[in-house]
């Protein structure tokens, strides 16, 4: 949230149990753009902020991106749009 966003967005998710969460952001053609190290989150609503940079700290172009949030028992996908 927000979507579309510029320059950053918060990706919200709800953890049903304390668990390790892994977040990856991809371009629409499947290229890995940003990978966040797995981290433990508490039960409830949490978020991870993405600043529109890739793993090399370069700004990514405007476009639609897909995120994948994975815990031990769940996988969630979502889309977000970066408008510059």
Question: PLM features: residue spans?
Answer:
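C-terminal tail/sorting-segment detector
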Residues: 58, 62-84
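Generic structural signal for well-ordered beta-strand positions
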Residues: 33-34, 60
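Signal that preferentially marks extracellular ectodomain short beta-strand elements
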Residues: 47-60
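Extracellular Ig-like/FN3 beta-sandwich strand-entry sites
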Residues: 18, 43-45, 62-64
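Glycine-centered coil/turn sites that cap beta-strands in beta-rich domains
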Residues: 1-27, 35-38, 47-50, 71
């Amino acid at each position: 949230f927000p979507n579309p966003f510029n320059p950053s967005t918060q990706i919200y998710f709800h953890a049903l149990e304390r668990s390790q969460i892994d977040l990856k952001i991809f371009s629409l053609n499947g290229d890995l753009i940003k990978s966040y190290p797995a981290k433990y989150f508490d039960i409830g609503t949490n978020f991870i902020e993405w600043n529109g940079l890739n793993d090399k700290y370069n700004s990514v172009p405007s476009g639609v991106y897909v995120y994948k949030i994975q815990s031990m028992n769940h996988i969630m996908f979502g889309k977000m749009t970066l408008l510059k």
